[in-house]
Structures are given as structure tokens and as C-alpha cells.
């Protein structure tokens, strides 16, 4: 009896060891091997390149944040800054400009204009290239020269646009709060703001060249992130009755913002892969009568990936520029009180479902036009496939491929832009319905830009890591394809 009990206990412990401790030991060994590969990667050339780019990016961002709070030289004592901040802290237009400039607008800092003039100039030149066939032809035929020329033209346009914006801000925003305003003080402010925008442009270009991601997008991302503490302080300092229903409403609003983040990431990463047949590969298979399974065909299959949202977050930025910047500026500054135009614009319910509907339509229209003019050209796609002797199965080369890709882009873009617009207007609808204070940091444009930069930075870091990353699958352990053209040739 005792021997049976001892044998049973031994069997139980052996089972526990085989089922629990042995797999855990194996997992520890695998983790140790992965850690060694990670340490090897830390010493690799690719990660060394990432470290250099990351350090360069952080140093340039540090310069931007310092310049954000530097006052305009020689003008610190000539402005009633406290009154300027109090009167404009509840102005929606001023809050948006302050958000995109990282707090420099309400501080009347050296970098008040921020990166907006450079982004406007780049976008204007992109649209102009697609509108004028001569510019598009010049860009295709002389790519390197065109790239240098476009870069130069973008800088010139940035200076012109920054000068115009500086005049508007100086004479409309700053002048009423100046203690001793004269022409020379205004000229000094205009020159300082223009120079600040040029310095921001240079830093953004350097981040793009030696940093981790696009400099313009990264600077706006940093400015948005920098306003998070102020937005939280604004929320708690507002006159809110912190009851259970209000706390529940706030949690619901935050949950909708997180849902917006996940949906935007999904839209940016989703799409439809379309298989492409390359004539040379098919000819080799037919020449050697090579049998191929469906699994092997999937591994070697070439695809064209049509994104669900080819225009990205640009439609949201464009719509926000119209309804949050252009219209308020036009209403508040270009029209006089009591004018019939002022009363007409004021009669439109821009803070209701009508604005949300206009927002949705604008995003969808701009997304459709931007996708076909800036991002993807179906005619160029068809010409490239034809030059590579490739075709889409079931679609003839040439005009049919152009029509097919056009229709596919329209369908995917309609779905993606509609979902994007719906997700962007949903938080504002909930805020108005529940009476929550509006936080600029949780606005659709803020979330879209932040996530767009995060996704782009992740892609670039992954591309820099390359094949040396220990987290990628080891291609040497995959089963090789059952193809050997050399043996077939020798046999023949």
C-alpha cells in the first residue's frame, strides 16, 4: 500500500515537472537566447544609426522648445501680455493657434508662427505641381534637379507666407495690447516672427534629413504633446460640478477619444492587396513545367497595396483649417460688427450638427481629390505595370487597368474617408450633448496628427532595424521553395 502511494506521488511530481517546469526552463532558455540577440543588435550598425538619429532629433526638439518661450527681442516691456492672455484664452481660434505652436502664440514668443507657414508652402507647391502639367513633367523628367528646385521654391514661399502672417498677427492681434505702438515696433515684430518661422523651417528640414521622421509633422506632434498639462489644468480649473454623472460623462468622452485613436490607426494601416502577375516569372514556370502549390504561389506573389485611406490625415487638417481657423478669422476680423455679411455668417449654426455635417462632407471631398491628384495617379500606375510586363489578373493592361484602379481607389477612399469623418465628429457631438468642456488636446486634428507621426516614426525605425532585428522571424528556418532552375537546366 505504501509503495503504491510512493509510486503515485512520484508519477504526480514527474507529471508536474514535464508539464510545468520543463516548458518553463525551455522558455527561459529561449528568452536568454533572444536577450543575447538583442544585445548583439544593440551593437549593430543599424541601431547605432538609430541612436544617432534619435539624439539629433532630441537636440533639435530641445532648441524648438527653448525658442517657443523666448520673447521677441526688445519688445517684452511694450506689451500687456496678461490682458492679451486673459482675453484670448477662451477664443477658439487663438486656442487652436496656441495648440499648433506649442504655447508660443499666447506668449507672443519668437516661434509664434511655428511650422504652419512651411507646411502651407509645401502643400501649396504639391497642389500646384498636380495642377500645372509643365511642373509635373519637370518633376518626372529631371527628378534630382526638380527636387532641389522644389526645395528652394518651398523656402521662398515659406518666407513670403510667414511675412504675410506676421503682418496680420502684429496689426490685428498684438497691436491692441501694445503700450507704445508705432511703425518701427510693428516692423520689429514682423521681422522677428518671420525670422522665427524661417528658423523653425530649417530645424524641421534638419529633423527630416538626420532625424527619425518627418520634421514638420514631428514638430506639430511635440507642440500638441506639450499642451497636455495645460489642458488637464484647464479641465480641473473649469467650473464643473464633479458629480457622479459628470465623472461618468468625462470617462465616456475619454473612452471615445481612445476609440478614435484605435480607429485612425486601423484606417491608416488597412487596405486591399491586389495580386499582380509578372510575365517573366510565369514564362519561367511554363518553360520548365514547374509545379507550384497554392501556398508557394502566395509566398512568391507580388501585390499592389491600395490603402483604405490614401490621403491619410490631410483631409482632417484641411477641414479643421477651414472651420476652425479660416471661418473664425474671417468672421472676427475681416467683417465689421453689424455688417450684413457678419450677420449672415453668424446666422449659420457652426457649433451644431450643421457644422459637423459640413465637416464630414469636406473631409470626404478633399480626401477623394487629394488621393487621386497627390497620392496615387491611376494613369501612372497603369503605365508602370505595362513597362514591367505585369498585369492584374482579369484586367487588361492599359486603359482597363487605369479604370479598374480608379474605381478601386474611389471605393476604398469612400469607405475610409466616411469612417474617418464620422470618428472625428463623434467626440464633438458627445461633448455638446453632455455639456463637457472642450479640450483642444482631444480634438480630432490633434489625435490624427499625433497618431500619424507615431505610426510613421514606427515604420521608419522598423526600416532602419532591417534584418538584424531579433524580433523578426529567422528566414533561414523557413522551408525553402521547391524550385531549382539550375538542376532543371542541367538535366535538360
UniProtKB/Swiss-Prot annotation:
GO CC field? cyanelle inner membrane; cyanelle thylakoid membrane
Q: What is its main location?
A: plastid
Keyword Transmembrane helix assigned: yes
Name the membrane topology term: Multi-pass membrane protein
From the UniProt entry, list the residue stretches annotated as the region Disordered: 468-492
- Locations of Basic and acidic residues compositional bias? 471-484
Give the record's keywords alphabetically.
Cyanelle, Membrane, Plastid, Plastid inner membrane, Protein transport, Thylakoid, Translocation, Transmembrane, Transmembrane helix, Transport
Q: Where in the cell is it found?
A: Plastid, Cyanelle thylakoid membrane; Plastid, Cyanelle inner membrane
Family to which this protein belongs: Belongs to the SecY/SEC61-alpha family.
Free-text function comment from the UniProt entry: The central subunit of the protein translocation channel SecYE. Consists of two halves formed by TMs 1-5 and 6-10. These two domains form a lateral gate at the front which open onto the bilayer between TMs 2 and 7, and are clamped together by SecE at the back. The channel is closed by both a pore ring composed of hydrophobic SecY resides and a short helix (helix 2A) on the extracellular side of the membrane which forms a plug.
Q: What is this protein called?
A: Protein translocase subunit SecY
Q: Which organism is it from?
A: Cyanophora paradoxa
